Amino acid sequence: SVMKNITDAPIHVQKRDKEEVYREARELLMKMGLEDKENAYPCQLSGGQCQRVAIARAMVGNPTLLLADEPTGALDTKAGNQIMEIFRHLSDQGMTIIMITHEPAIAACADKTYHILDGELRTSAEPEGGADHAEA
């Protein structure tokens, strides 16, 4: 289930208190708009909902860094925009998000971009400057 997916590692690997982890997971599901999906299984979720579950899972423990590899790549525009709105909110709260994307429009949302082209690292202070050539 969604809840098991979010809580297994903190409870069994990190040995955190089960009640505390479940409370935190429920709060995260509310923030992700998934409070009614706690007992759902992956086959019952949309792609965007699965991505939001993955973000909630990564957020347990209130990390200061989130790594996101193609977080919108398999999503339709609406779901991708929802994920980016979540990232904007997290960034506004002080979280650092490192995101890998091939989508120039998604890269343009970043405060800072790094582009890799033909194995060479290129840095751009402005997301629009060179985002059309992003091959990261």
Report each predicted region and the residues it spans.
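Helix N-cap at the start of a conserved alpha-helix in ABC-type nucleotide-binding domains
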Residues: 77-79
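Conserved catalytic loops of ABC-family nucleotide-binding domains
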Residues: 86-99
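Conserved signature/switch motifs of ABC ATPase nucleotide-binding domains
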Residues: 40-43, 61-62, 93
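Hydrophobic anchor residue at the start of the ABC signature
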Residues: 55
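ABC nucleotide-binding domain "signature" region
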Residues: 20-32
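Catalytic Walker B motif of ABC-type/P-loop ATPase nucleotide-binding domains
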Residues: 66-69
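Short coil-to-helix segment of the ABC ATPase nucleotide-binding domain corresponding to the Q-loop/switch region
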Residues: 1-8
